From Swiss-Prot:
Region (Disordered): 1-22, 44-79, 121-142
Designated name of the protein: Protein Rev
Protein source organism: Bovine immunodeficiency virus (strain R29)
Keywords attached to this entry: Coiled coil, Host cytoplasm, Host nucleus, mRNA transport, Phosphoprotein, RNA-binding, Transport
Biased composition (Polar residues): 128-139
């Protein structure tokens, strides 16, 4: 109360109360805690009083700035470390899945290339389903007796209906569509 009268006599309107409180602390009349409480109750801006009483003036988000304004954001690691950890784990899982898929596709392509190579050479390999057909029929009668180079299969797209009658002339057990065969026998 005496402080208010002193300020009123000097014509101050709450502007220099921090200095007055500091003087009283230095002279031993107030403790720091009492001075802070006096400043909060009498001279502080309205939002400090509301924050002090547990009623924040501005809406704050639960992971947000926390006193730096309702739009203020913390640093990414400071915000939610669990979120970033789980995000990194998800990215790593997806990368591993994609690698497994690609390695499976590479194996399948290699199997098909080996199958084509065996069939074009006419070598009877018991693991291929159509090896018996190749060994019985002469290569001139088998539609796959003469094959283009491997690059042909990688560059062309599938056209299974053009010159092929898949029920009669295709080698049994050999899915021609998977080989991207495009030329027919005419």
């Amino acid at each position: 109360m005496d402080q208010d009268l002193d300020r009123a006599e000097r014509g101050e309107r709450g502007g220099g109360s921090e200095e007055l409180l500091q003087e009283e602390i230095n002279e031993g009349r107030l403790t720091a805690r009492e001075a802070l409480q006096t400043w909060i109750n009498n001279d502080s801006p309205r939002y400090v009083k509301k924050l002090r009483q547990g009623q924040p003036e501005l809406p704050t988000s639960p992971g947000g700035g926390g006193g730096r304004g309702h739009r203020a954001r913390k640093l990414p690691g400071e915000r939610r470390p669990g979120f970033w950890k789980s995000l990194r784990e998800l990215v790593e899982q997806n990368r591993r899945k994609q690698e497994r898929r690609l390695s499976g596709l590479d194996r399948r392509i290699q199997q098909l290339e080996d199958l084509v190579r065996h069939m074009s050479l006419g070598s009877p390999d018991p693991s291929t389903p159509s090896a018996s057909v190749l060994s019985v029929n002469p290569p001139a009668q088998t539609p796959l007796g003469h094959l283009p180079p491997r690059s042909y299969f990688k560059l062309k797209r599938v056209d299974c209906g053009a010159g092929w009658d898949l029920r009669t002339t295709a080698a049994p057990g050999l899915p021609i569509c998977e080989l991207d065969w495009i030329q027919g026998t005419k």
